[in-house]
Amino acid sequence: ELHQKVRQVCTVGFIPAKESAGRKTYRRSAVFILLKAIFDVAGKENVDHVVIHYSIGNALYFTMKGSAILNQELIDKVKVRMRELVDRKIPICKRSVSTDDAISMFHRHHMYDKEKLFRYRRVSKVNIYSLENFEDYFYGFMAPDTG
């Protein structure tokens, strides 16, 4: 990952978006930005959760539960917010926490499906990504920033 320092002599290679690993990293990062934008625009108190179901071409099909109404006005505001986040090139920070701490975080953020899933996780550490005050878990690498 690009935020890590090289500690010994080695060969560094870059993974472009045209390769599968690069595309997946880009997509995860874009989803993270989308989720943050939705919660920023609609308000955390108005969104219970967002579920990304699958992709259709270059688009994502998702559902949103809560009192916020998913309409064209909200979509337009989310798009503007995503562009603001991208333009600011905000670091996407990764931290390793205990699985128990991750479970507590998921509960605090009303991510009950992840909370339940992680109760069965055997690994003691989990990587949590944060974008300003927004946190989530993703399986795989992320871009170093929103730009």
Predicted regions and their residues:
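Short acidic beta-strand-loop surface patches of small beta-rich interaction domains
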Residues: 1-3
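Loop/turn positions that initiate beta-strands
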Residues: 7-12
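Short, hydrophobic beta-strand segments
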Residues: 13-18, 58-69
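N-terminal catalytic cores of NTP/NDP-binding nucleotidyl/phosphoryl-transfer enzymes
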Residues: 14-43
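Divalent metal-coordination and catalytic microenvironments
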Residues: 32, 62, 140
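Secondary-structure transition/capping motifs at alpha-helix termini
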Residues: 40-46, 87-88
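Short, flexible active-site-proximal loops enriched in glycine and acidic residues
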Residues: 44-57, 72
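Non-catalytic interaction/regulatory segments
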Residues: 56, 65-147
